[in-house]
Amino acid sequence: MSSQHAAQISSGTDEPVEEIYYRKGDIDFCFLLNRRHHNLRVFDYRVGNYQQKRDFFDRIARAEGLRKVFTVVEKQDSKSWRSVGFSREGAIPGYFRTADAYIMSRVYTEDGEPIQGGAPKMGAPLAVPGKEGKDKDLKSVVKPRGLNIEFIRDPALLEDIVRGVGQDALYAPFRRGVFNPDIAVQAKTGKKEYWVGAETDSSFGHAKVDMLTPPMKDIELPVLEYCVKALLDELHKQETASVFALCAADWTLSNQVYSELGFKVTARLTDHITRADEFVGAQLWHRRLAHVAAPKLSSLLG
């Protein structure tokens, strides 16, 4: 990347995720390269020619063997990305606090060629029991007997946890700078341990939730449901307005947890994650926690 004036700011090239800046001429942006999941997220600074940007990412996709390039933008910017071959795969309501985010994607063949006609649509979603789309009072979620929970905020510990369980959980960091949750619920019942984490963004009042130890059996559903609920309660105390989660579309039990807690699917993302040697579609679940007004100018100015 150095020949293209891209500056690496992550810890090393052997890491599964790199954050890279690119600046050349009037093009200026940052991107998150996730080699484990064969995708790349663009953080665009809204300057430069979109066709040049697209051509640049097409070259990276071929060089890195990527399946997907995507970006998360406001509505007015989505039109520019659509004009150069990106497809809208869904939205994250309230992602920018007062505006929704559109997920714009470009999917590639095994030969690194962009798939013509845009990202292929995923098949029909699996039937998931629960109350998807309905508001649910989180107070009604009962704590399983014998379950003990603790909130963890130690960055080093959270980094170690992701390093240990992240791959099996299909964890994929979504933000810049820190590639692990900054808060997590650690739950214990007997000899079994569970982790649910969140990447928070106080500027925009949202958080991404991940079950780092996803349910493998029906009997684990009440435990994970309570862990997610406890984390949502804590995020609400931090004035988080909304949360979202990315989940493999065929992980029925994990999808059921979000459904039972009143999340609803707002995006279906083709070949968004990689499991073993297989590209897997993902569902994006969203839930609003509170209607938090945009900060007053006086608070921003101190």
Where are the model-predicted features located?
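Conserved active-site tyrosine of GNAT-family acetyltransferases
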Residues: 80-81, 257-258, 263
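Conserved acetyl-CoA-binding loop-helix of GNAT-fold acetyltransferases
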Residues: 47-60, 219-235, 253-256, 260
